[in-house]
Amino acid sequence: MRKKVLISGAICVALCSILLCGCGSASAESGSGSGITITNVSYDPTRELYAAYNDLFENYYEGEKGITVNVIQSHGGSGSQARSVVEGASADVVTLALAHDITLIEEAGLIKPGWIDEFDRQSSPYTSTIVFLVRSGNPKNLHDWNDLINEGVAIITPDPKSSGGACWNFLAAWEYARRNISEDEEAIKDFMAALYANVTVMDSGARGATTTFVENGQGDVLLAWENEALQTLKEYPDEYEIISPSVSILAQPSVAIVDENAEKNNTADIAKDYLEYLYSEDAQRLIGTYGYRPSDQSILQEFSDKFDLGMTLCTIDDFGGWNAAYDIYFKDGGIFDEIYER
């Protein structure tokens, strides 16, 4: 396999940890008229969503409870963000790309066991899936996963070692191969090795991968969160197309209170209110507007013209849940490493 370009998120994570630690301990206390500040450590492509949601929540909370709230956002590759919290970033809440990243914070003693049942729908207020973003006219004629292994196709995808979206990308491709090529693991590995041989750049997070594809003009196809692809179409309506592969995956980002930090910062109640409000009708409609699939199925149907609701989607349960999937595919020495090092 030829050498890839790997862009590390380590520097970004270190800076994020320093900045959030510096502001977190003093930020969350309610002062005389100064209100309350909480920090949301999130994954890469949620910047626009949470900028809008924070305004919605802040206005709601001041109107309902007379309390001024300021929400600080932090964004990066989901795995890197989880590690930054473990290493000291003072997050009151985390809104990450996959449950396993929150489990890492739980295992560090910062989040109480049972967090996945604290909020509705397994603490997943919105979902997404994985699609292909191609240039207008689809010049390489890419329609499904098997087209991505063709000679001369340049793929852009983030690195599963730092990006939650990249893990969803990998699993969606794996499930396609299992259903359409062979159930034999070695045959699936061969397919995945051919696919990753065509990856030319691996950024540390989904937004970085989008920048590589869109701003820098590299690659023929971006393996993208559906919401990120929709955002790109909104910004560049005549330059790109979304391709829905025959098989993808129901990506379920997760949210949780970072209990130890929230208790220390005296923000536990408002942190809970902040995450609960994601399930309100107003927030669910905002979520749909920003290209995420509302977890409220009735509101999701209001966006049926925006999302391809007929896609065949596997789920993380098809891989035994996130803890099992992470150990098999993404831990050091796992299947991803085996494939990538071929």
Model-identified regions with their sequence ranges:
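Short, low-complexity disordered leader/linker segments with a strong preference
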Residues: 1-37
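Short beta-strand->loop
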Residues: 41-43, 134-135, 153-181, 195-199, ...
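Ligand-binding pocket segment of bilobal, Venus flytrap-like solute-binding proteins
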Residues: 181-246
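N-terminal segment of the mature folded domain
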Residues: 28-162, 340
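Extracellular/periplasmic juxtamembrane helices and adjacent flexible linkers that interface
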Residues: 262-342
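Sec-exported extracytoplasmic/periplasmic mature domains
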Residues: 54-63, 86-90, 99, 106-110, ...
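Residues embedded in well-ordered beta-strands
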Residues: 131-133, 241, 254-256
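Short helix-loop capping/hinge motifs at secondary-structure junctions, enriched
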Residues: 137-143, 162, 175-183, 261-269
